């Protein structure tokens, strides 16, 4: 019985039950837990037709792989909790 309990405890410690990343997400710029498998935070910015009035559009979120920046977009990724604050 003791051996079985020890094995269960060791298994739980080794599995770590899948830590998930915490990133800021838009539209509310809220710190949220990312879905399993999405271990990167990203920040994407671009200009829309109102750029000269209110600045660049900012998108924050979680991702499994860093999104490829399209023309006239800036994209950065990072791998620590809340490493993508609103610029």
Curated annotation (Swiss-Prot):
Gene Ontology cellular-component terms listed: extracellular region
PROSITE patterns xrefs: SNAKE_TOXIN
Source species: Laticauda laticaudata (Blue-ringed sea krait)
Tissue: Expressed by the venom gland.
Subcellular location: Secreted
Cysteine disulfide partners in this protein: 23-41, 34-62, 47-51, 66-77, 78-83
Protein name: Long neurotoxin LlLong
SUPFAM superfamilies given in the database record: Snake toxin-like (SSF57302)
CDD domains for the chain: TFP_snake_toxin (cd00206)
